[in-house]
Amino acid sequence: MSTDPQAEVIARLFKPRSVAIIGASGDPQKTSGRPAAYLRKHGYAGKIFPVNPKLDHIGDWPCYPDIASLPEVPDVAIVLLGAERAHVAVRELAAIGTPCAIVLASGYGETGETGAARQAQLREAAGSMRILGPNTIGLVNLTDGIVLSPSGALEMDQFPVGHIGVVSQSGGILGSLLSRAAARGLGLSKLISTSNEVDLELSDFIHALVDDPATRVIALYIESVRHPHKFREAALRARRAGKPIVAFKIGRSEAGAQAAVSHTGALAGSDRMYDALFQQTGVIRAQAFSDLLDISAALATGRVLHGKRIAILTSTGGAGTLVSDSLGLLSFETPAPDAATAAALRALQTGDHASLDRNPIDVTLAGLQPTLLRSILKVLLASPSYDALTIIVGSSGVAQPELMAGAIQECLPLSDKPVLAYISPHAPAATSILTQSGVPAFVSAESCAAAFAGMWHVQQWAAPVTETATAHAGVVTTDLPTGPLNEAQAKQLFSRFGVRCTRELEVSTPQQAEQAARSLGGPVVLKLLSSTVTHKSDVGGVAVGVTAEQVGERLQRMCADVEHATGTRPDRFLVQEMVSGGTEWILGMHRDPLGVAILLGQGGVTAELFKDTALRLLPTEGGLGRAEALAMAQSLKCWPLLNGYRGRAKADVNALLDAIVAFSNMAAQLGEQLVDAEINPLFVLPEGQGVCAADGVATLR
């Protein structure tokens, strides 16, 4: 038994010895009558205590008039009362020492201020008792046949029991996933609807499923992550335990994000921040809702994809091309068999009608012969040419769905390579039979490819190396103003944390500008100095390649241009050394409900045009390490520009990594004091010459 009190409570939720049903009904057609009916139907062996002052009995169970009358403290209570009365029952349950209550009522934080106040009242009433919900559909322990839910999706006589644990912030989606899994023969272990998460939330159940021996894969339907640090800790623990997480995050569009907020009353982070969170924690993001179960099904087999070479075995050429194309789009390879494999295949079948020496391997109508199929499978599974196998079921799957299943199932123990199936026709029976036989079957070529991609993600992902960024203890910022900093002030801040910045002088007159240019030497850059104008070039506030002889006149012209564009005559300027050579990058920070992220991408005036950027969330403490900084840079499409693209000189990547680490350390150390910050451009010079911040903005509180 775990010594963690929360783990013990969730263990009781999954497998309670007794259940109280507050507001129970004797009518199994009603929502209030279903929990008791489902518990009986699926053979629950524990005690059931219905509570309803209007009834003496519900079936064989005595019905109690109130919570105080219960014969013992239940492990779990299901509260079926409306939002206006649920908190009273919760308070009474807490008073008798009930470990946990499931509150189904809606009308809480998802409805606005009044509902939020009601939700706070519910939290206060619970005291130390744990709450699942409100606005939840409950949970189901399919492993042990324990139903703590009134969902109509649970009317089925037999649950599809397997190794996928599902946590959803939507109760309705939970029922949808159960029915979809059952229809395709895909087994699940646990189903949990967290919904408003007044107490127990997503991360708590990730931890619980990591500890659950029946669960191999964790599938999440996410509307918002309310506690990012807890989520990160739980997700990394799952990966260390060898239990991959697949997540479908709603809210990728503005409309979807607004709908998610209105559904649970939680602030949603930006979608790209979720990409960063998932990437850093090894969570596989399902791009389509159907991928959530598809990828999970492949991972639940426990088979490992060690390479990207896929054999396609088909009896229909068109479907083989579909699968090959879908795999190619995700960077998988479908090579022809090696000479020995091709010879072994040709020895099994003769005639021009077969295409056994290419990939897809097309057995045509001979695929209907189980003996031949069995022999071909053995050859392909043993072949060094392939890391995995896709079997395509053609029209034979409609009339005789069991035809291929037996042969495939017999061959599976011969190899630990992943084997997936694509069902080309509409053949639900074939899908179910193959999936139950240990071969996840998919109804689209794209889903099959996505499943392989999920398996490859698990194999390739490595936990981030924990590094401590160089500390800059005692960095003084009290001399800098609060609010938006001008460029000179922002670069003072950056340089104090270790980012090299351009040499520059502040001027107000043409004469001062000329003196500054001569002092710096060579052509210079003349800039407007302002804390309110961010995009200086848009208002005529930047001039490059200006000589000392030209700079005075150029300053006067800039005054006129800026005044015309903004309505205000400027009186402060920067004369700055020109940086030549290298490539321009953007290095910034972004604050979000999910946390603070560091952004790296192609910079200069094209930054917003190309939008080639990478994000990394800061860890709980400290900045990013060099390994994470390098991973950021290498993930960009423009990484080759740093790495000697087409004979160009290699850039000073080490200096760039130092700058990323320093900048992130600044964001971590200043915390809430730093509202935003950005360097654009950050010049990354040729190897050995370092980097140089040529412009930047920052805002301090």
Regions of interest found by a model, annotated:
Residues 1-701:
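Catalytic-core regions of core metabolic enzymes
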